[in-house]
């Protein structure tokens, strides 16, 4: 049977350590490795990691953050985990996509703010793709002015140039970069090693360099994840090792 074009052929150096499993037994290795804590998140540079980590270390910090970067570089994941580590699953966190902003959104935001004050918590508002607010951005600006330094607002965007200058002036902007092929190798190896797959760094580097399109120099986490899943599916997979249960012998 002919091999599907979507799955790259692997050089002979790729080896499997562990037991082969069928595709049906093989969920996405990348999805299983989704970050659960801030320290699990992959960053392309330590400056951004350290600056954003302060919002976790000091939960009393307020203000407005804009996370800008290319598609699939982890902006929404960063925002969600900052909120989770500061507030857990309380009702003081409100998340919305920019294109879902409705006439009653400000009413909901004020309700969240008032509830958080009763609970003596600093509320967090996450607005994904804030540039898609378009002409409604001034309503968000007025809300930020109304509650200045009394909540944390985390906004994400793929297009910083589409955000009104007054919002950018009121916010700290952090560039969430993609990963150059050398850094992508490090990210991929952490997941592959969990599944007992031995892949040479140079082979991974060549694979990621081939995934760059045109004059691109960086890969998104989604691109790295798809490559990892293809490798796990093709080469084989074993579950992360757990202590085996003792065998009982009846005599």
Task: For each feature predicted by the language model, list its residue ranges.
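Pre-Walker A (pre-P-loop) alpha-helix and adjacent loop at the N terminus of AAA/AAA+ ATPase modules
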Residues: 24-68, 112-115
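Walker A/P-loop
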Residues: 56-95
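Conserved AAA+ ATPase "SRH/arginine-finger" region at the nucleotide-binding site
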Residues: 98-99, 172-185
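The conserved phosphate-sensing helix
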Residues: 213-232
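Short conserved motifs of the RecA-like P-loop NTPase core
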Residues: 198-215
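Conserved catalytic/switch belt of AAA+ P-loop NTPases
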Residues: 114-115, 127, 131-169
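Short glycine-rich substrate-engagement loop in P-loop NTPases that contacts/grips substrate
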Residues: 46-50, 91-123
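Conserved C-terminal helix/linker of AAA+ ATPases
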Residues: 232-251
